[in-house]
């Protein structure tokens, strides 16, 4: 059985988001086990939860966020009835500032946009990309 790489998770803080609630755009990139049709829409509804909060400096904190979800996609083998799935279950961090010690930190996800990324001439690709807006509220 082959070894699969972890997803690359890249959170970006929205411009102007300097106080709670903080707004992030989270990009999840994952190499799929099998090639998928670039034209087919993969399904991925990630769940996000706050795992922990750590102080890293005066007024500076890092929230460890857990993401979990299943990517469902149609492989490029002509068999539309044969959907494949691949699990993502990982942690990533979101930095934030707070003048007081946080007593509660929550995360809420917006609607994810999912694609199979490929070049113009490619009909199949293993590159799955998902974008999800997140709101991090600190109290």
Task: Please place each PLM-identified region on the residue numbering.
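Viral structural modules
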Residues: 1-139
């Amino acid at each position: 059985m082959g070894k699969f790489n972890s997803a690359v998770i890249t959170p970006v803080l929205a411009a102007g988001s300097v106080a709670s609630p903080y707004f992030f755009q989270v990009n999840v990139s994952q190499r799929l086990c099998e090639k998928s049709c670039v034209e087919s829409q993969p399904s991925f509804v990630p769940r996000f939860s706050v795992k922990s909060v750590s102080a890293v400096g005066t007024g500076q904190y890092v929230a460890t966020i857990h993401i979990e979800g299943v990517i469902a996609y149609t492989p490029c083998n002509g068999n539309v009835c044969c959907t494949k799935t691949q699990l993502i279950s990982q942690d990533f961090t979101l930095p934030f500032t707070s003048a007081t010690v946080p007593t509660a930190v929550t995360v809420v996800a917006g609607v994810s946009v999912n694609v199979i990324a490929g070049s113009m001439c490619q009909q199949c690709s293993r590159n799955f990309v998902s974008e999800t807006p997140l709101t991090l509220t600190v109290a």
